Amino acid sequence: MYYILNPNVGLRSWWLVPYAYYIKGNRNAIGLKKEEFELLSLCDGKHDLEETPLLKRFVTAGMVKALCPCEAQSVSPDPWQKRECDNRYFPAMNWMITGKCNYNCLHCFNAADAAPLMSEFTLEEAEKLLDEAEKCGINAFTITGGEPMLHKHFFEILESIYRRGMFVEELNTNGYYINQEALDRMKAIGCNPLIKISFDGIGHHDWLRNKKGAEEDALRAIRLCVENGFHVKAQTNVHRWNLDSMLPTLKLLDSMGLYETRIIRTTEVPRWNQNAAGATLELQEYFDEMLKIVAEYIKEDHQMIVDIWQLMTILPRQKAYRIRSVECGIGEYRDSIPVCRGNRGMVAIAANGNVFPCLQMSGYYEAKNDILGNVKKDGLQPLLQAGKYLSEVCTTVGTLAEKNETCGKCPYFKHCVGGCRAIALTLTGDKLGVDLSKCLFYKKGYYEKTVSIMGDWVNHSEIQISKN
C-alpha cells in the first residue's frame, strides 16, 4: 500500500533535533523517534509499505493517508514537507520589517535615543531573508516595527511568508493603518494572526504615542479586528501618570470583546529615560499597584485574559492564574534550561538587520554598539550555526548560576531561574546580572500576597516557599 503525508505535516531535521515535524500553523516542532521519522519519510506516494501497527497509528492520527496505486503515480509531495536544516533549531522569528513609524513614541525600546528610526528591509532583502528562514526551518513569524503596516511592501511580505508554507503568528501594530480593506486582504492571504494593538489607557494614549488622535485610532482598529473575527491583544504600558486609568481601561477592553490585554511596566530603556524622568514605577510600587488592580478586576465577571508583566496571567474563564515569576514548578528545574526560553526559540531581527536576544533589548545593545551579527551582511544560517548571537541565546541557567553568585546561592533560583535577562541588563548593565524584580517578588512575599488575593482560583504555578 502507498501512503502520503497529510499536507499539513512537514518533517524537519536540525542539529541536535534530527527527528521532528511541524503541523502547519503551529509554531513549535514536535519530536519523533528515529523509526517514526524514517517511516514518515517513506510516506511519499512512491514506496509500497507494509501496514504495520505504527503506520496504522499514523493513519488514525491523521498524519498520513493511504493511496491507491493510480493515485500514487500522480503524487508530487510539497517540498515544504521535508527539509534538512544545517543549523540549530529555531522555530520562530521576531522580525522588525521597518523601523519607520507614523508615531514617535516616548518609550520606544527599539531606539537608542530620541531620534526616529529610518532603517527597513527592502523587498529584495525581505525575500532573501525569507529564503534563508525557510532553509533554516523557521516556521512562525511575529511581524513588528516601527509600524509594520507602514512598509510599502507589507502585504507582499505576508504573501511571501505564506507562499513558503510558513505563517504569521502575531502582528504588532499601533492600529492606524488597519481598515476593512487591509483585513480583507489578510484573510485572502490566509493570514490570521493574533493582532497586538498598543493602547496605553483611557485619556493617556495620545501622550505616550506622541500623536494626536492615536487613542481614537487604536480603539477603532480594535473594534474592527474583533468584528472581523481576529484575536486581539492590547499592549498597555503603565507608568505613574496613567496608573489611575488601568482598571477602567481593562473594563472597557473586556467589554469590546478582546481576547487578552497585557499590562507592561514602562521600563528604563534609553528613550524613555530621556523623555519621562520620574514617570517610571519603582518595582515594589509596580507590584503593589498591580495587585490592587487584580483584586478589583476579579471581583466582577470578566472574560478577557489579563497578562501583567512579570507578575501574573489571569484566566477568568477558567477561574485560574499563573504567576509569571515562577518559571519552574516543583521538580522542573534543570541546569540545561536556556536563560530565556523565549529567546532560544525566536530569532529577533531589527530593521537594520542586526540580531538580538530579544527586541526589547535592542535599544540597549545599539546604544552600546554591541553587535551580535547582522543578517543583511552575514546571512541568517551562519548566525544559527555559531558565533556571538548563538552563544548568548544558548547560555544556560546553569552557567548563570556559576557566573552570578547571588543567583547561584539564592533559595528561589530554581523557581525564577534567574528571571528576565532584559530586566537584568537594563537595571544592572550585566547580561548575567540579577533580575531585581524577581528578588523583590520572592523576598518581599509577593508570591504569598498574590495567592492570597486570588483566593480559591486555581494556581497553575504552585511552589513550596522556603526562606531558610
Which role does the model predict for each range below?
Residues 5-31, 53-94:
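N-terminal [4Fe-4S]-dependent radical SAM core
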Residues 30-48:
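Short amphipathic alpha-helical recognition elements used for nucleic-acid or partner binding
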Residues 86-124, 136:
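Canonical Radical SAM [4Fe-4S] cluster-binding loop centered on the CxxxCxxC motif
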Residues 100-110, 357-360, 405-423:
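Local cysteine-cluster metal-coordination motifs and their immediate loop/turn environment
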Residues 123-144, 151-282, 286:
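Radical SAM/AdoMet-radical enzyme domain recognition
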Residues 129-145, 434-468:
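Short Fe-S-cluster ligation motifs
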Residues 284-327, 360-408, 458:
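C-terminal accessory region of radical SAM enzymes
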Residues 339-344:
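Short, small/polar residue-rich loop motifs at catalytic or cofactor-binding pockets
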